[in-house]
Amino acid sequence: MASATLTAWIKMPSFLKKILKLRGRRQEDESRSRMLSDSSMLSCRVNQLTSEGTEAGSTTPSTLPKDQALLIEPKVRAKEKSQHRRPKIIDQVRRVESLGEQASQRQKHMLETLINKIYTGPLGEELVQTLYLRIWTMEETPESLKILQMREDIRDQVLKMKTERWLRTLIRGEKTKLKDFQKRYEEVHPYLMKEKVEQVIMEEAWSLAAHIVQE
């Protein structure tokens, strides 16, 4: 049979031989291409499985060897604990301007009433006049000169705002008692010794807020 096939091939016209050769080469190319494609798909699948295994190993200590899992678990627990603690720490941070909002309802009402009178009533005019005279007669400092050289309406507003800040510093918490009132003054005393203008304003705020403090 092989001899007959060879004889038929010899007798075949040359153009048919070329066609058959081209067809054979095309089939070989297609077969080689399929093999490469299958190999590439297999390689991708292996890489994907390897990647999944690596990710799973990095997030689940149970898939790691026992000694490695023991090292990772404390780190995971520590991270979870720090995430739970973080909001509590943030909750404790408060700006001075919002401290008055933590006061008891009665003290909060009295504090806001007092601050409103400072900004809108004769109490505020009396306050800024007293502060101006005290600052004018005190030992000269850069801060006192700055305030005395301000335009009157701007100076009055600045003194009222500084007084409000100190009032909110003194009256805060669920219920401010006399011992709390005294303690808060002592906390800022070192600062006041260096800032004489602030000391004068703090003393006036102390005097204004004394009636709010509960025994």
From Swiss-Prot:
Disruption of the gene: reported phenotype: Knockout of the 4 isoforms completely abolish the ability to suppress the induction of IFN-alpha-stimulated gene products and the subsequent establishment of an anti-viral state.
UniProt-annotated stretches for the region Disordered: 12-34
Species this protein is from: Sendai virus (strain Nagoya) (SeV)
Oligomeric form and interacting partners: The different isoforms interact (via C-terminus) with unphosphorylated and phosphorylated human STAT1 (via N-terminus), favoring the formation of parallel STAT1 homodimers. The different isoforms do not interact with host STAT2. C protein interacts with L protein; this interaction has an inhibitory effect on viral transcription and replication.
Localization per Swiss-Prot or TrEMBL: Host cytoplasm
UniProt superkingdom: Viruses
Gene name of the encoded protein: P/V/C
Family to which this protein belongs: Belongs to the respirovirus protein C family.
Note: The C protein is found in virion at a ratio of approximately 40 molecules per virion, presumably associated with the nucleocapsid. The P/V/C gene has two overlapping open reading frames. One encodes the P/V/W proteins and the other the C/Y proteins.
Keywords in alphabetical order: Host cytoplasm, Host-virus interaction, Inhibition of host innate immune response by virus, Inhibition of host interferon signaling pathway by virus, Inhibition of host STAT1 by virus, Inhibition of host STAT2 by virus, Interferon antiviral system evasion, Viral immunoevasion
Annotated GO CC locations: host cell cytoplasm
Consequence the record notes for mutating F181S: Complete loss of STAT1-binding
Biological classification of the source: Viruses, Riboviria, Orthornavirae, Negarnaviricota, Haploviricotina
Residues annotated as signal peptide: none
Any one biological process term the GO annotation gives: symbiont-mediated suppression of host type I interferon-mediated signaling pathway
Cited function: The different products prevent the establishment of cellular antiviral state by blocking the interferon-alpha/beta (IFN-alpha/beta) and IFN-gamma signaling pathways. They inhibit IFN-alpha/beta induced tyrosine phosphorylation of STAT1 and STAT2. Blocking the IFN-alpha/beta pathway requires binding to STAT1 in the cytoplasm. They inhibit IFN-gamma induced serine phosphorylation of STAT1. Block the IFN-gamma pathway by binding to and stabilizing the parallel form of the STAT1 dimer, further inducing high-molecular-weight complex formation and inhibition of transcription by IFN-gamma.
Region Involved in self-degradation and in host STAT1 degradation, residue ranges: 15-22
PTM comment text: Y1 and Y2 proteins are produced not only by alternative initiation, but also by proteolytic cleavage of C'. Only alternative initiation is detected in vitro, whereas in vivo cleavage seems to be predominant.
UniProt remark on domains: The disordered region at the N-terminus is involved in C protein self-degradation in trans. This self-degradation of C protein may play a role in the regulation of viral RNA synthesis. The disordered region at the N-terminus is also involved in the host STAT1 degradation in order to counteract the host innate antiviral response.
UniProt protein name: Protein C'
Cytoplasm listed as a keyword: no
